Design a protein with these regions (language model features):
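Generic secondary-structure signature for well-ordered alpha-helical cores
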Residues: 14, 18-21, 42, 46, ...
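Iron-sulfur cluster-binding cysteine motifs and their immediate structural context
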Residues: 18-43, 64-92, 140, 144-147, ...
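Ferredoxin-type iron-sulfur electron-transfer modules in oxidoreductases and energy-metabolism complexes
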Residues: 1-13, 33-65, 81-108
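Residues forming the flavin
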Residues: 1-7, 12, 91-262
Length: 262
């Protein structure tokens, strides 16, 4: 992970020009207010920077590590001199400072009497649960996996997103009153009773297939299956030998050069 000290982080943030039309904000799927939290950061106002970031982003410690950083690709400094503000790394630094300095304090809101079931404990389900819980709804998350996180836990390698970072946030959500029912397969024809509404947040766990010559040959695997299996092995799970995806000693061709392929 990037290890620039706080002084260098502030210098990076000071490079933000607070453009009249902030393309960084416009291209961010979350609508993050990059110029505003960069301004607070460059002035050393870490708490304020986190407050601005938290307005639009429930989990900046995740996105600050694995987001494709569309904001940086559209940064005017990127377009003019190919050296954008390090927005994503600044975001991660702000989130880590918030945990370290105690800015993140679990709050159990006053309940409004409504119960919501969230199906899926991936990033979408967790975000929905966090927002609904903050509004006073009593939220229970269901997921078929033994641990929450979805692709954050089972699809992203540890070197990009350490699992203790996920666990730390789950502890906050639990302390705020969100309940987790893990290892539960939900039948969409028979939803769990006792809830006023349901949010289906099952994500996209199915890999994209290719209809090309040779697709039927043996030894072809989806990256998601391989990454998920490796993460589960690191968590202590075991698999029969015939189910293991092992490339040791073999010549490997990777189709796709994005983050997953890398």
């Amino acid at each position: 992970e990037q290890t620039l000290n706080s002084h260098d982080r502030k210098l990076q943030a000071s490079r933000c020009m607070e453009c009249g039309v902030p393309f960084c904000h416009w291209t961010c799927p979350l609508g993050n207010k990059q110029p505003e939290f960069q301004d607070a950061l460059c002035k050393g106002k870490w708490r304020e920077a986190y407050q601005v970031l938290n307005e639009t982003n429930d989990f900046p410690e995740f996105t600050g590590r694995i987001c494709p950083a569309l904001c940086e690709k559209s940064c005017v400094l990127k377009l003019s001199c190919d050296a954008p503000v390090t927005i994503r790394e600044n975001e991660a630094a702000i989130a880590e400072a918030a945990f370290r300095e105690g800015y993140i304090v679990p709050v159990r809101p006053e309940r409004n009497g409504w119960k919501i079931a969230v199906i899926g404990a991936g990033p979408a389900g967790l975000s929905v649960a966090a927002r609904l819980n903050a509004c006073g709804y009593e939220v229970t998350i269901f997921d078929s996996k033994p641990m929450p996180g979805g692709l954050l836990r089972y699809g992203i390698p540890n070197f990009k997103l350490p699992k203790e970072v996920i666990d730390r946030r789950m502890d906050v959500l639990k302390a705020e009153g969100i309940r987790f029912e893990m290892g539960v397969c939900i039948d969409m024809q028979k939803l769990p009773a006792g809830f006023d509404a349901y949010a289906v947040c099952t994500g996209t766990p199915t890999a994209r297939d290719l209809t090309i010559p040779g697709r039927e040959l043996k030894g072809i695997y989806f990256a998601l299956d391989m990454l998920a299996q490796q993460n589960r092995i690191l968590d202590g799970e075991t698999f029969p030998k015939e189910q293991l995806v092992n490339a040791r000693g073999k010549r490997v061709l990777v189709i796709g050069g994005g983050d997953t392929g890398s």
